[in-house]
């Protein structure tokens, strides 16, 4: 194909090597008269040729690289204006147009803008400087264009001088939405803010977070890249590299920069997705070289080139990988298709691009449609051959389908909307004016109406928002190979307001899912149960995966941090993907330890019943009588039974009633039991006391019923205050990581301690009294056993304190149960078991005579000891008196001693002791 083009070129006859325009009219590309003139700016050529003059002169040069797609855009504007002229919208008012070729150069666009702003019907073609342009009549009333954002920015700054409406069909730079800087600019496409937002959303949804970006070094490229970078960061997407290419093909460094960009793409092997904000000719050159280097990636196309046929038809373009792009929402363009079918009959006298296209088609008449675009772009305005009009028409007729194939429906529709918006605004403005007159209205008046106009394309209604934008949305397109040809397929729609992709069928949904199979990440994906941990890289997308700690979880991939479980109700192990509900634990009835403790409690109750039966059947025996009688024994046995029964409230699911009952029941019943033991200790001590003063004191103190009631009553008051002021209650202990301990919270540690402390004080008093009576007769040694019982109690509860404070969990109640059982069994065994042993095994000693003999022997032994003590004491006194006293004093002493002789004093003392012994035996017998 290249050889054929070269051959054709060699036979060209160069007819024109002069400058592109001699007069301003030569600068006009397409023109048609009308009552109201509309300007148009289109980059019909992709570059302007450089001047060979030295030094360079300020002259407009010829252009090269005919852009078929942009040429079709000029035809779309012409067709849309003719649709309005042929309708009844303006009632006889005809719209005219002046369309200029910017050659993708801002300079050329500004030159055309100067002509737009020049004074109407002035032969000098000048822009008149004025302080007030309110009544100024320029050459045109409004401008459609330009396509590229950088050009529109420059043009808009000039049009702002007269507030001339400018409606762009393709410029998407976000900065143009700023109505302070660009008050007269409007557009029929969305801002790049929405496009970059949609791109970032697509990338995130596809699971990519490590991408590259390529843009141009101009206003559009820099602004688009900055906006995209912000949107990408908000979606946790990192840009591995940002490559910037020169804005114009005339730049000598563009080839070098493209090669450097491709080297960067190859070097970043983990980057498989690249966002491209470039012009069509940049993409064409980039892709051509990328195919040569066998680079295959996912290319995210901007709306500038996503549907460009020139790029889609690049040979072997499928080797580049997948192309996913965003295109302007398309509408009904069927009438434009019909217009193209009759293009060969359209007059081209005032349509230089059409005439040029016809000549290019003629020059490339032997080229196939697939290569025609490349052939056409190789010519410049200075290297064309001219043919007869009839021959040109024949070639155009043969190439009608080729033109339709190069149509970009989204852009064609946007141009139609721009023309329709102006048409409806002019209609509203001309309802009370004669718009056939050139001075019917000024451009700034049209701008005011245009901002608020509601217009239609025949089906849908539209209006500009506060920023002058028409947010029609985007089509998400995918390049697919069909029958050996690359085609553009609509994959989804992007809703700007809801920020969602709307798929139309199952096939497109499948295409979306296939995108997720491609990996483009800096780091390996963190699985559920892990979280990302930053590394030394400056990018947040480069990380390492670490497991979630205990009580944390992550249920999605690539989570930035693990989520905390609700520690009160849930838990999670290390590297968990979910939270598990905590198991509620308490000392349940089916627990082996609980069963053992209950068995011991029931055994204790059985012992109590057995002892009660034994005592009842042996009610008249001395052992039972010496124990205080059946009433005292029953009271103590009932207290023991209640103590054993209270352990049942420590087992099972805690309830408020059980929590309040268990400590109160134990405290009151155990206090009553200890109070009874206290009275027994006092009675024993009183019965066998030899000290007259102590005996008198114990007789005054010994009041059994008041002692029991008082001691027990104090404990009742303590427990009552406890229940009223800070009653125990059920509490969920959540301090353990995996379980909830359902337990009784004692309410007040002070009250709990006071209750136990009070019992301890009573037990200590009992211990002291019992210890004093530990040397009683062998068959009457109850005090000795009481001493052992109290010692067991003290040991048990002293051990309880550290064990209770250090034990945690569901077995905490078991600690108190064990202590209760030990203290209860200790007292029960020490008080009642010896008596039962005597009743059952030593019945001979369980008689009144045996007890009297035992008491007599003990009393005699006690009296002999007492007599010996008195004799020793009296002898010592006598010797002292004999040695130290005078005869007179001796006489006084004798008189004081009942007037007995001095030599019988020892015998007199012995007699008194024997008398006391008789009295003591009578007292012991009465106590029995």
UniProtKB/Swiss-Prot annotation:
One GO term of the biological process aspect: adenylate cyclase-activating G protein-coupled receptor signaling pathway
Protein known as: G-protein coupled receptor family C group 6 member A
PROSITE patterns: G_PROTEIN_RECEP_F3_2, G_PROTEIN_RECEP_F3_4
GO cellular component: cell surface; plasma membrane
Function: Receptor activated by multiple ligands, including osteocalcin (BGLAP), basic amino acids, and various cations. Activated by amino acids with a preference for basic amino acids such as L-Lys, L-Arg and L-ornithine but also by small and polar amino acids. The L-alpha amino acids respond is augmented by divalent cations Ca(2+) and Mg(2+). Seems to act through a G(q)/G(11) and G(i)-coupled pathway.
Keyword Transmembrane: yes
Taxonomy, superkingdom: Eukaryota
């Amino acid at each position: 194909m290249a050889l054929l083009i070269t051959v054709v070129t060699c036979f060209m006859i160069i007819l024109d090597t002069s400058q592109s325009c001699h007069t301003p009219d030569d600068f006009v590309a397409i023109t048609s008269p009308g009552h109201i003139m509309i300007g148009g700016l289109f980059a019909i050529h992709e570059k302007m040729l450089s001047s060979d003059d030295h030094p360079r002169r300020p002259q407009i040069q010829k252009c090269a690289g005919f852009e078929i797609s942009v040429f079709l855009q000029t035809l779309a504007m012409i067709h849309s204006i003719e649709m309005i002229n042929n309708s009844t919208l303006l009632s006889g008012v005809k719209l005219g147009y002046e369309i200029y070729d910017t050659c993708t150069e801002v300079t050329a666009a500004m030159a055309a803008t100067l002509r737009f702003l020049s004074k109407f019907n002035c032969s000098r073609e000048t822009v008149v400087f004025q302080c007030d342009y309110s009544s100024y009549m320029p050459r045109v009333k409004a401008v459609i264009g330009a396509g590229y954002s950088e050009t529109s920015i420059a043009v808009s700054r000039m049009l702002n001088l007269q507030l001339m409406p400018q409606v762009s069909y393709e410029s998407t730079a976000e900065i143009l939405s700023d109505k302070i800087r660009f008050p007269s600019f409007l557009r029929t496409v969305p801002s790049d803010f929405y496009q970059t937002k949609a791109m970032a959303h697509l990338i995130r949804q596809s699971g990519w977070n490590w991408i590259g970006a390529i843009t141009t070094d101009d206003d559009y490229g820099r602004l688009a890249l900055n906006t995209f970078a912000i949107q990408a960061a908000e979606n946790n997407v990192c840009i591995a590299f940002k490559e910037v290419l020169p804005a114009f093909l005339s730049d000598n460094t563009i080839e070098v920069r493209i090669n450097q960009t491709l080297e960067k793409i190859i070097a970043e092997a983990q980057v498989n997705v690249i966002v491209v904000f470039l012009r069509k000719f940049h993409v064409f050159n980039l892709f051509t070289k990328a195919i040569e280097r066998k680079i295959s990636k996912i290319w995210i196309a901007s709306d500038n080139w996503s549907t460009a046929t020139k790029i889609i038809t690049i040979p072997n373009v499928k080797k580049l990988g997948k192309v996913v792009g965003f295109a302007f929402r398309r509408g009904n363009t069927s009438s434009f298709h019909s217009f193209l079918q009759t293009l060969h009959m359209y007059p081209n006298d005032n349509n230089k691009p059409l005439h040029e296209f016809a000549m290019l088609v003629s020059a490339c008449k032997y080229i196939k449609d697939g290569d025609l675009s490349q052939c056409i772009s190789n010519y410049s305005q200075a290297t064309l051959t001219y043919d007869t009009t009839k021959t040109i028409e024949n070639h155009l007729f043969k190439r009608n389908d080729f033109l339709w194939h190069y149509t970009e429906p989204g852009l064609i529709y946007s141009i139609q909307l721009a023309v329709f918006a102006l048409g409806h605004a002019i209609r509203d403005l001309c309802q009370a004016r004669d718009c056939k007159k050139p001075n019917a209205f000024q451009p700034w008046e049209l701008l005011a109406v245009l901002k608020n106009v509601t217009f239609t394309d025949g089906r849908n209604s539209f209006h500009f928002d506060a920023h002058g934008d028409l947010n029609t949305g985007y089509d998400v397109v995918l390049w697919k190979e069909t029958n050996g040809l690359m085609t553009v397929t609509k994959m989804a729609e992007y809703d700007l307001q809801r920020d969602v992709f709307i798929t139309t069928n199952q096939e497109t949904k499948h295409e979306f899912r296939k995108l997720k199979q491609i990996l483009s990440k800096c780091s390996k994906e963190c699985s559920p149960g892990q979280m990302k941990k930053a590394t030394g890289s400056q990018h947040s997308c480069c990380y390492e995966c670490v497991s979630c700690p205990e009580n944390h979880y992550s249920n999605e991939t690539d989570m930035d941090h693990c989520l905390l479980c609700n520690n009160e109700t849930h838990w999670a192990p290390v590297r968990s993907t979910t939270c598990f509900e905590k198991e509620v634990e308490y000392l349940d009835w089916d627990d082996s330890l609980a069963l053992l403790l209950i068995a011991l409690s029931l055994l204790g109750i059985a012992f109590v019943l057995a002892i009660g039966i034994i005592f009842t059947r042996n009610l008249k025996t001395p052992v039972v009588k010496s124990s205080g009688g059946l009433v005292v024994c029953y009271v103590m046995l009932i207290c023991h039974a209640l103590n054993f029964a209270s352990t049942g409230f420590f087992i099972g699911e805690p309830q408020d009633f059980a929590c309040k009952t268990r400590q109160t029941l134990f405290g009151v019943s155990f206090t009553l039991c200890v109070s009874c033991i206290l009275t027994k200790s006092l009675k024993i001590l009183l019965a066998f006391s030899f000290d007259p003063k102590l005996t008198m004191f114990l007789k005054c103190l010994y009041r059994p019923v008041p002692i029991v009631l008082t001691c027990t009553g104090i404990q009742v008051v303590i427990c009552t205050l406890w229940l009223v002021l800070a009653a125990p209650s059920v509490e969920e202990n959540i301090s353990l990581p995996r379980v909830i301990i359902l337990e009784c919270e004692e309410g007040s540690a002070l009250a709990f301690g006071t209750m136990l402390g009070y019992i301890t004080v009573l037990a200590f008093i009992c211990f002291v009294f019992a210890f004093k009576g530990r040397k009683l007769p062998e068959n009457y040694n109850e005090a000795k056993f009481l001493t052992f019982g109290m010692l067991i109690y003290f040991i048990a509860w002293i051990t309880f304190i550290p064990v209770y404070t250090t034990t945690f969990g569901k077995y905490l109640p078991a600690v108190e149960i064990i202590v209760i059982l030990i203290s209860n069994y200790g007292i029960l065994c020490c008080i009642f078991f010896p008596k039962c042993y005597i009743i059952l095994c030593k019945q001979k000693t369980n008689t009144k005579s045996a007890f009297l003999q035992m008491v007599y022997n003990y009393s005699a032994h006690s009296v002999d000891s007492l007599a010996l003590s008195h004799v020793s004491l009296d002898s010592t006194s006598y010797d002292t008196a004999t040695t130290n006293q005078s005869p007179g004093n001796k006489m006084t002493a004798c008189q004081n001693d009942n007037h007995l002789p001095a030599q019988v004093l020892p015998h007199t003392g012995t007699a008194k002791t024997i008398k006391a012994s008789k009295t003591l035996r009578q007292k012991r017998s009465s106590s029995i």
